Amino acid sequence: MRVLGIETSCDETGIAVYDDKLGLLSHALYSQVKLHADYGGVVPELASRDHVRKIVPLIRQALKNANTEIADLDGIAYTKGPGLIGALLVGACVGRSLAFAWNKPAIGVHHMEGHLLAPMLEDDAPEFPFVALLVSGGHSMLVKVDGIGLYEVLGESVDDAAGEAFDKTAKLMGLDYPGGPRLAKLAAKGEPAGYQFPRPMTDRPGLDFSFSGLKTFTANTIAAEPDDEQTRANIARAFEEAVVDTLAIKCRRALKQTGYNRLVIAGGVSANTRLRETLAEMMTSIGGRVYYPRGEFCTDNGAMIAFAGLQRLKAGQQEDLAVKGQPRWPLDTLPPVA
């Protein structure tokens, strides 16, 4: 089976072709980072318009690179949600229109299921069951995964997600958009400076996350300290360590609660070097393994949507002709794949 995947949930237009026997045949990505940089964040209307401008040329490019004709496709998968409604509707309109014109089945994919399954694009893919840590700009959640569609959300962010906290803290430090990667780069130059940053919600039972208080603590620290490059690097390091430690503590709890010894990390923040190293050390210490996608598949991309959609289309799942976007969509409401 061969599927065209379309991702337009936020500020990246991602298109890919995936074949269940040959693997990933092509993927094309256009990032809107430069477009939104002047505004310090994503402007939804501008994001939607840029998707309109780029999506059809990228589809042509992906099909050409995959040496795939329309007749070779067995289905179309597009991101249905969660995300920015205008951006979602661009991908949904194009995906549904092509499915109708080409007489192909189509399915709307959950964006976070795409991230969750992204490590399965790798040669050394995880087997079920496992615990998944999904960390991105809009989501932080721990999920018990027993199969595709067999999800139990164990904990999630009650305010700012981890990626959002990175971006907002970067802005407080005067770093350009996108802030998260720039803050991590600055933190790599930092030294231990004795800052006692909190590890939010680790002093009580439970697996939920909260990073808004940590962001405020960081803002107060920035205001109280000298404004020089090394001090900012030290504060960035202390902030990053606090976020990573918090995520690691919650992961350990989730693994203990489920009894599983496999951990998947995915989403944009999963590209963070300190997070990967910390979780790898933790899993080694408890005799488990950690899995994550390659860097280019940590951020939003069409490959993960093509793969996730293929699993459901192959199981006979598809949707009607209605164009639908779902900006809010609980992950654990998805049907299982038989």
UniProtKB/Swiss-Prot annotation:
Name where it's found: Cytoplasm
What InterPro entries would the database entry show? ATPase_NBD (IPR043129), Gcp-like_dom (IPR000905), KAE1/TsaD (IPR017861), Peptidase_M22_CS (IPR017860), TsaD (IPR022450)
Provide one Gene Ontology cellular component: cytoplasm
Q: Which amino acid positions bind substrate, per UniProt?
A: L134, V135, S136, G137, G138, D167, G180, N272
Cofactor requirement = Fe(2+)
Q: Does Metal-binding count among this protein's keywords?
A: yes
Q: Which NCBIfam families match?
A: gcp_kae1, T6A_TsaD_YgjD
Q: Which PANTHER family match?
A: TRNA N6-ADENOSINE THREONYLCARBAMOYLTRANSFERASE, TRNA N6-ADENOSINE THREONYLCARBAMOYLTRANSFERASE, MITOCHONDRIAL
Protein family: Belongs to the KAE1 / TsaD family.
Stated name of the protein: tRNA N6-adenosine threonylcarbamoyltransferase
Native species of this protein? Shewanella sp. (strain ANA-3)
